[in-house]
Amino acid sequence: MAVEMFYDDDADLSIIQGRKVAVIGYGSQGHAHSLSLRDSGVQVKVGLKEGSKSREKVTEQGLEVDTPAEVAKWADVIMLLAPDTAQAEIFTNDIEPNLEDGNALFFGHGLNIHFGLIKPPANVTVGMVAPKGPGHLVRRQFVDGKGVPCLIAIDQDPKGEGQALALSYAAAIGGARAGVIKTTFKEETETDLFGEQAVLCGGTEELVKTGFEVMVEAGYAPEMAYFEVLHELKLIVDLMYEGGIARMNYSVSDTAEFGGYLSGPRVIDADTKERMRAILKDIQDGTFVKRLVANVEGGNKELEDLRKKNAEHPIEVTGKKLRDLMSWVDRPITETA
């Protein structure tokens, strides 16, 4: 089924320019949204709790900052870009008491609305504007006169103005220059979670670790295994990112291409596909989100235990040692400290 697409000519920038926008959160997306909205002639304030380390950065970049409650009271459009696991508390404590008839509550991801963790009053427009790229790219493309494609969705539309407002917002951060895709909260949330869990984060991570283990257990040096299953992954992903699977296969050697065709289906087979379907079902029926909420309510104990176990995998020890040899690789603070 073809998606519905919109561009700058379909958007009325004056709609969002006539509103007061509160952006709650100043992480990757928060800073990109806030600065680009301001540069598009929109009134913007940033909401951050007292004592937040980001407050100084906000003022240095010429934006006004106040508490989430105060900016929510001031604004008529509120974009909630805090982490998923913090949003419900922020909504309950800071946003909901300050919502007025006709306000709009926007999100950059649909999880809390789709799974009912946040339930806005019926007289509020609920929408989503979600750039399909990290915040630094969203901002850089905007400054360069370009844009990153965006998704928009509307969950509640009491006044029938939700889509026009979301499209105007997307245009103000550069999204309509590239293209805006209309979706639903359900589709965005479930596809995003599935991609993260089955392929991008969970699936890729386990594939890499298992490949490393097989090689080391067969007697190969851990350093050789690291190079072959992790380090070179970037080369392959970059080719796929630029031109799809066909570009990758065109660019690698005939030996690599032929071997991939033969052995790939032996690794990812029909049983794997069934397990992927089970993962998707857990997402769709709320099983995953219930576990996510339980983890947060338990003080993130399960997440911390999983992080600790992951950090102890031999591939991490080997990788840290090898990355010391790579002057061209940006090192995370945790490795350079």
Swiss-Prot record:
Entry GO terms, CC: cytosol
GO molecular function: ketol-acid reductoisomerase activity; magnesium ion binding; NADP binding
Free-text cofactor note: Binds 2 magnesium ions per subunit.
Cofactor(s) of this protein: Mg(2+)
Residue ranges annotated for the KARI N-terminal Rossmann domain, each copy included: 3-183
UniProt binding sites for NADP(+): 26-29, 49, 52, 54, 84-87, 135
Binding sites annotated in the UniProt record for Mg(2+) 1: 192, 196
Entry annotation: catalytic residues: 109
Keyword tags: Amino-acid biosynthesis, Branched-chain amino acid biosynthesis, Magnesium, Metal-binding, NADP, Oxidoreductase
Residues bound to substrate: 253
Pathway entry: Amino-acid biosynthesis; L-isoleucine biosynthesis; L-isoleucine from 2-oxobutanoate: step 2/4; Amino-acid biosynthesis; L-valine biosynthesis; L-valine from pyruvate: step 2/4
Catalytic activity: (2R)-2,3-dihydroxy-3-methylbutanoate + NADP(+) = (2S)-2-acetolactate + NADPH + H(+); (2R,3R)-2,3-dihydroxy-3-methylpentanoate + NADP(+) = (S)-2-ethyl-2-hydroxy-3-oxobutanoate + NADPH + H(+)
Entry-linked HAMAP family: IlvC (MF_00435)
Function according to Swiss-Prot or TrEMBL: Involved in the biosynthesis of branched-chain amino acids (BCAA). Catalyzes an alkyl-migration followed by a ketol-acid reduction of (S)-2-acetolactate (S2AL) to yield (R)-2,3-dihydroxy-isovalerate. In the isomerase reaction, S2AL is rearranged via a Mg-dependent methyl migration to produce 3-hydroxy-3-methyl-2-ketobutyrate (HMKB). In the reductase reaction, this 2-ketoacid undergoes a metal-dependent reduction by NADPH to yield (R)-2,3-dihydroxy-isovalerate.
Sequence similarity: Belongs to the ketol-acid reductoisomerase family.
Protein name per UniProt: Ketol-acid reductoisomerase (NADP(+))
Organism name: Mycobacterium sp. (strain KMS)
